[in-house]
């Protein structure tokens, strides 16, 4: 049987005060890149969104080394997404006792990092078979035809 191993860690930043559109501009540049390359790109880009994203990438790498014992050289950003958050509404006083509404947008940023050195699946049958070599393993399914390859599905 194949058991799924967790090879991904994430860091989530909520209610970051910037528009989701401006944060997506930076996130699109780092998606799918390695950890070291991402840090280098974020340090050199001139956008205000780089600093909170840098902190999230650094936090996700710290989660990977703490929870899974991963090396930072093996980490790759597998998923990075920006969602629109709540809009803070403020009033700006204007002339003649009037006021204008100001909308301050927020966003939620999720960074998911994957360790490429770990296998995603663990074959528990091979581990059990190596411990008990007398175990008979047959690879036949109850709903297969006798000729082999056709499944009995409509």
From Swiss-Prot:
It comes from the Eukaryota. One of its GO terms (cellular component) is large ribosomal subunit. Keywords: Chloroplast, Plastid, Ribonucleoprotein, Ribosomal protein, RNA-binding, rRNA-binding. It holds the Pfam family Ribosomal_L22. Coiled coil: none annotated. It is found in: Plastid, Chloroplast. CDD domains: Ribosomal_L22. One of its GO terms (biological process) is translation. GO terms for molecular function: rRNA binding; structural constituent of ribosome. Its main location: plastid. Belongs to the universal ribosomal protein uL22 family. Part of the 50S ribosomal subunit. This protein binds specifically to 23S rRNA. HAMAP family: Ribosomal_uL22_B. This is Large ribosomal subunit protein uL22c.
